[in-house]
């Protein structure tokens, strides 16, 4: 049998609920998607639970699951993925955190968890921190900028553990939290103490930084602290090619996703202008996927803009991003034709009126370039997906893709 190449397209936070501004439609229902609709003639669709029904998935656990790795077995926390995706090279026993540049007042009350989100000076602030901190109590500290307000912080040294709590209160008008040990070990107490000293040091440096003084003079919020969460010790993960036999690559601008893909052995490409936001280079990402599909068996294409709009409650932004998603699919079909297996879904549901992840299932579409018993539906959205034949978990995705690309191996005699 002919083996087909695979495109797996995830629009982050794609799933939604009825939106008042859209007359009770979801953004995916509201948008006309001619290119995706063209695929329906040879597609099966349905609903996917990224982890299992009702479980509110993070982007980290959902992607592990969709890549065929059970998060209950392999997930240790998000920090290490963020750090790798932001450029860190980790070794065993390193502890990494994800973080936000944020704004606090002089009483450590959070004014804005993202310091306005778009921080043009983020690279310079990270450079200043790396130059002025270096280590605390013998523990080496390194800072890495991801995208927008996102930062990764890596601790290296003896006696560290990821069994410590976050400093991020996850809400505005709340005080920055003290990190606390999550067990009774001396390593947990030591690491929590390091984090608390580090947080105060970060504030001292950033609050007096000339960069932030200029931001304030322009009417912008100072990025004067880093809120830390998701502590994770670095552990090796199985390599994607070893358990799928697929030579794989990914297109993403988001540090978390880049980190996961890199850690399981995928080549990761971030095209010029790809930002992880609504202003990303949509067609540049599609073109990058096209080029990679000439060389690789499996290409993962990630779009963060849908989730960014959802978290901001930006209905028009999510509609715009879904329109661009359809253009991306059209661009790929124009350049490569339809001789591909194509899966399109979201990694979780982020309703734009809720502004947070929920445990709702996400619509899932699987197109194949040959005759199958297709699902008879009119569109690709949450409501039509309920009429399709699929009800799967994230862990089922790779097996489906291997089967329909004619690459699956027989289980048993």
Swiss-Prot record:
Key word Isomerase present: yes
GO biological process: glycolytic process
InterPro entries listed in its UniProt record: Alkaline_phosphatase_core_sf, ApgAM_prokaryotes, Metalloenzyme, Pglycerate_mutase_ApgM, Pglycerate_mutase_ApgM_sf
Keywords, alphabetical: Glycolysis, Isomerase
Pathway: Carbohydrate degradation; glycolysis; pyruvate from D-glyceraldehyde 3-phosphate: step 3/5
Gene Ontology MF term list: metal ion binding; phosphoglycerate mutase activity
Signal sequence annotation: none
Catalysed transformations (reactions): (2R)-2-phosphoglycerate = (2R)-3-phosphoglycerate
EC number: 5.4.2.12
Keyword Isomerase part of the UniProt annotation: yes
Alphabetized HAMAP family for the sequence: ApgM_A (MF_01402_A)
PANTHER family in the cross-refs: COFACTOR-INDEPENDENT PHOSPHOGLYCERATE MUTASE, METALLOENZYME DOMAIN-CONTAINING PROTEIN
Family to which the UniProt record says this protein belongs: Belongs to the BPG-independent phosphoglycerate mutase family. A-PGAM subfamily.
Function: Catalyzes the interconversion of 2-phosphoglycerate and 3-phosphoglycerate.
The protein's name in its UniProt record: 2,3-bisphosphoglycerate-independent phosphoglycerate mutase
Naturally occurring in which organism (per UniProt): Sulfurisphaera tokodaii (strain DSM 16993 / JCM 10545 / NBRC 100140 / 7) (Sulfolobus tokodaii)
């Amino acid at each position: 049998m002919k083996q087909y190449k695979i495109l797996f397209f995830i629009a982050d936070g794609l799933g939604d609920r009825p939106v008042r501004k859209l007359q009770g439609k979801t953004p995916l229902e509201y948008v006309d998607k001619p290119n995706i609709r063209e695929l329906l003639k040879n597609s099966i669709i349905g609903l996917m639970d990224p982890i299992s029904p009702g479980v509110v998935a993070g982007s980290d656990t959902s992607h592990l699951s969709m890549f065929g790795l059970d998060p209950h077995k392999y997930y240790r926390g998000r920090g290490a993925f963020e750090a790798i995706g932001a450029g860190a090279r980790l070794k065993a026993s390193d502890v990494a955190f994800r973080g936000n540049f944020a704004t606090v007042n002089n009483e450590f009350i959070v004014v804005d968890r993202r310091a306005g989100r778009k921080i043009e000076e983020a690279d310079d602030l990270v450079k200043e921190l790396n130059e002025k901190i270096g280590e605390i109590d013998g523990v080496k500290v390194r800072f890495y900028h991801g995208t927008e307000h996102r930062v990764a912080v890596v601790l290296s040294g003896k006696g560290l553990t990821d069994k410590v709590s976050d400093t991020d209160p996850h809400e505005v008008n709340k005080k920055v939290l003290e990190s606390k040990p999550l067990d009774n070990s001396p390593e947990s107490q030591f690491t929590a103490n390091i984090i608390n000293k580090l947080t105060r040091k970060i504030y001292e440096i950033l609050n007096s930084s000339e960069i932030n003084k200029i931001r304030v003079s322009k009417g912008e919020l100072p990025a004067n602290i880093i809120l830390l969460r998701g502590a994770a010790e670095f552990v090796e993960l199985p390599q994607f090619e070893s358990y799928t036999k697929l030579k794989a690559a990914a297109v993403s601008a988001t540090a978390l996703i880049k980190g996961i893909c890199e850690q399981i052995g995928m080549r990761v490409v971030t095209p010029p202008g790809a930002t992880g936001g609504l202003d990303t280079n949509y067609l540049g990402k599609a073109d990058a996927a096209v080029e990679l599909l000439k060389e690789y068996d499996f290409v993962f294409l990630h779009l963060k803009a849908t989730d960014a709009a959802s978290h901001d409650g930006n209905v028009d932004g999510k509609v715009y991003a879904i329109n661009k998603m359809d253009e991306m699919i059209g661009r790929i079909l124009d350049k490569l034709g339809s001789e591909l297996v194509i899966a399109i879904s979201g990694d979780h549901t982020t309703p734009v009126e809720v502004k947070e992840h929920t445990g709702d299932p996400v619509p899932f579409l699987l197109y194949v370039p040959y005759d199958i018993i297709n699902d008879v539906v009119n569109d690709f959205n949450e409501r039509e997906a309920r009429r399709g034949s699929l009800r799967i978990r994230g862990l089922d995705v790779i097996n489906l893709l291997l089967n329909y690309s004619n690459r699956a191996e027989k289980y048993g005699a």
